[in-house]
A protein has these predicted regions:
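Active-site histidine-anchored catalytic micro-motif
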Residues: 1-79, 83-84
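ATP/pyrophosphate-binding catalytic subdomain of soluble kinases
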Residues: 94
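Conserved SGNH/GDSL esterase-like catalytic core that processes O-acyl groups on lipids
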Residues: 87
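Alpha-helical segments flanking ligand/cofactor-binding loops in enzyme cores
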Residues: 22, 90-91
Length: 95
C-alpha cells in the first residue's frame, strides 16, 4: 500500500472488517477504524451505525406478519440478526 502512496487506511465496519484493519496495522499500515454494527453491542455508545435502520426494517416486517397472523389466527415467530446481543429483538418488539 505504501508503494501506491496510501498514507492511511480508513475502514468502517463490524468485527470482520476491524479484525482485518488490525492485521494491516500490525504490518505497519496507519489505520483508522470506525465501528459499524447493526447489533448495537459496542461499549460506551448508546446506538451504533446501522441499528436504527435494522429496527425500521424489522418493525415493518413484523407489522406485515402481524396482519397475516391475525387474519389466519396463527402465531408467528420472527428471528432477527444480532449475533450474541438481543437489542434488535428487544427494540423491534417494543416498537
Amino acid at each position: 500500500m505504501k508503494k501506491e502512496g496510501v498514507d492511511v487506511l480508513v475502514v468502517i465496519g463490524g468485527d470482520g472488517t476491524l479484525t482485518s484493519a488490525r492485521d494491516f496495522a500490525r504490518k505497519g499500515v496507519n489505520v483508522i477504524g470506525v465501528p459499524k454494527t447493526i447489533d448495537n453491542d459496542l461499549a460506551s455508545t448508546d446506538v451504533t451505525f446501522g441499528f436504527n435502520t435494522a429496527i425500521d426494517v424489522v418493525t415493518e416486517a413484523l407489522d406485515r406478519l402481524h396482519t397475516t397472523a391475525e387474519s389466519h389466527h396463527r402465531i408467528m415467530l420472527c428471528e432477527v440478526m444480532g449475533r450474541n446481543a438481543g437489542w434488535i429483538a428487544l427494540e423491534s418488539g417494543i416498537a
